[in-house]
Amino acid sequence: GGIKPGVLGFTDEELQVLVSEAHHRGMRVACHARSAAAVKQAVRAGVNFIGHANYLDDEALALLEANRDHVFAGPAVAWEISFLEHYQSFGFETGSPEHEGYAAELKATQASVRRMRDAGVRVLVGGDYGLNITPHGTYARELQYFTDYFGFSPGEALQAATKHGGEAFMPDGRLGTLETGKIADMVIVKGNPLEQISLLQDADNIRAVIKDGQI
């Protein structure tokens, strides 16, 4: 059973009602959308955050670009990359359907993320954590994935995690950057992540965490 790949889980009318009702109640809407058809449906319905967006076609990219002022995308690649780094320890062989499937998906994701970035679509860090190979507390490694796999500079990866993440959660602009009058959420680190993004993965380099102005 289950839904076949490429088959949309909702009709356009169903999704539009869900999004409309959520927005009416002051909520923002996130969805999982891997195929180009799903991404296009989500953008047309007014979804705020699209998770994955692995397989974009030209029409899907054009829709994202046209709506880039109010839609965000997050590839959520930690699961894919972690699997590809450790698949043999899970009992899978090189060339197995699982290995080849995730490798192909990552290749498609790399192409889609680079296209979104070039089109000015805000691409976010995070997603699909809390699993055995993506435990909570390991989010910082995804910033390195953005530099290693998607061609982001360390500064661009940090911006995806902070400024753009803040804009996604609080469109009023109160979160995500260090400016007078904004929410004082920040991390003080030893070293310069603009020169070495991987230092954020070492807890010993985290000197202080400030939340709402409180250490």
Each model region followed by its residue ranges:
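His/Asp/Glu-enriched, well-ordered alpha-helical/loop segment
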Residues: 24, 94-97, 107-192
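Short glycine-biased active-site loop of nucleotidyltransferases that positions the nucleotide triphosphate
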Residues: 42, 135-138, 198
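Generic structural signal for individual residues within well-ordered alpha-helical segments
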Residues: 16, 62, 158-159, 198
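Active-site core of metal-dependent hydrolases
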Residues: 1-107, 124, 129-131, 150-151, ...
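Short aromatic-centered micro-motifs
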Residues: 209
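Short, Lys/Arg- and Gly-enriched loop/turn segments at beta-strand edges
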Residues: 193-199
